[in-house]
Design a protein with these regions (language model features):
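Bacterial Sec-dependent N-terminal signal peptides
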Residues: 1-29
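Short coil/linker segments at helix-helix boundaries
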Residues: 58-172
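A general structural-boundary detector
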Residues: 19, 42-43, 123, 158
Length: 172
């Protein structure tokens, strides 16, 4: 019976994992930012809203990439199983706002597990791009200025909402 529950739990975890947006590797995300940024330097391409939306989207992917395949609510077992081979360099008991949490230290991020062993905070300690959210916001703003016909309004609105939500989470 225990084996059946274990198999069902693993299947549910894998299904939840597939439901998550596929996160680019940090190297791929940084490469995409560099390529999109180079496109914005081309005068002909820089006059198109789509160029700026693509650049802003690449910046947002670069913002998310260091988080890896982790998501809020993961259990410690899921972190160990689905972490993509990443292992923490240190594990510490820390006090966060009066709450005892377990801090898992990685090369580019810190994961904070609550008292129930669930992932509650993902702190990126080594962002791929400096001031990435401001740059993404500015790129979406530039896209909106160039989108006279309103063809990219939906993409711009979704991107701005994504950037704003990320900024709220990080207190920016």
């Amino acid at each position: 019976m225990k084996k059946l529950f274990l198999v069902l739990a693993i299947a549910a975890s894998l299904q939840a994992f597939d439901a998550q947006a596929q996160v680019k590797s940090p190297a791929a995300a940084l490469s995409a930012v560099q390529k999109a940024e180079a496109t914005t330097q081309n005068a002909k391409q820089a006059a198109k809203a789509a160029t700026w939306v693509k650049y802003a989207d690449a910046l947002m992917d670069a913002y998310e990439a260091p988080k890896g395949n982790f998501w809020l609510g993961m259990s410690r077992q899921e972190i160990d199983m689905l972490g993509g081979g990443e292992k923490p360099s240190a594990e510490q008991a820390v006090d966060v706002a009066g709450r005892q949490m377990t801090k898992l230290v990685y090369s580019n991020k810190n994961l904070y597990l609550n008292e129930n062993g669930q992932l509650e905070v993902i702190e990126v300690s080594a962002p791929l791009v400096d001031d990435v959210l401001t740059k993404a916001f500015d790129a979406y703003k530039k896209a909106a200025e160039l989108d006279a016909k309103g063809q990219k309004t939906k993409d711009i609105s979704e991107g701005l909402a994504r950037a704003a939500c990320a900024g709220e989470v990080n207190g920016e």
